[in-house]
């Protein structure tokens, strides 16, 4: 069995004329990413794949997660083509992960990350900013990942973290 943690980047500011890829996290986005990192600290195992879109806001979100986990930023892998990547692109990349990894993590953008969770679980999902979906996958090799192979185990949102 494998587990996939799919995260949408934290809340970002308006573009104000800058390219969308360069948008940065707001103070709320930073705070939510740090909280999500603390929330998932006991779930994360050092060395598990952490693949991230190269957009500034996703990179910042992943760095805050690493900070909360007590991991070096070296833990994250910037996937050059992941900016606004489709669910199918994510499936291709995840399928290349080492089989020794029982779990893997991605930080990306909607609609791609929400579409990925939907494709894997056959359940409608729309991740809010700094939302996380945990997907349980019943296979031993990441290369076996395809539509319908997952079960949605949980959704975490910034609001749900406040309630607990």
Model-flagged regions — what are they?
Residues 58-59, 87, 113-114:
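Short, well-ordered alpha-helical microsegments
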Residues 95-105, 148-158:
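A polyampholytic, Gly/Pro-enriched intrinsically disordered region
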Residues 123-153:
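Domain-level recognition of soluble alpha/beta enzyme cores
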Residues 2-82, 124-127, 164:
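Active-site-proximal alpha-helix that buttresses catalytic centers in soluble enzyme cores
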């Amino acid at each position: 069995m494998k587990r996939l943690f799919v995260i949408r980047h934290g809340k970002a500011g308006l573009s104000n004329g800058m390219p969308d890829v360069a948008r940065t996290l707001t103070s709320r986005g930073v705070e939510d990413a740090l909280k999500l990192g603390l929330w998932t600290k006991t779930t994360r195992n050092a060395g598990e794949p952490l693949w991230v879109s190269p957009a500034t806001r996703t990179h910042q979100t992943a760095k805050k997660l690493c900070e909360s986990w007590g991991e070096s930023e070296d833990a994250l892998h910037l996937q050059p083509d992941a900016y606004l990547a489709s669910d199918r692109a994510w499936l291709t990349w995840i399928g290349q992960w080492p089989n020794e990894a029982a779990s893997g993590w991605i930080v990306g953008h909607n609609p791609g990350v929400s579409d990925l969770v939907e494709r894997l679980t056959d359940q409608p999902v729309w991740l809010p900013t700094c939302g996380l979906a945990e997907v349980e996958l019943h296979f031993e090799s990441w290369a076996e990942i395809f539509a319908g192979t997952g079960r949605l185990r949980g959704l975490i949102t910034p609001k749900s973290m406040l309630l607990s």
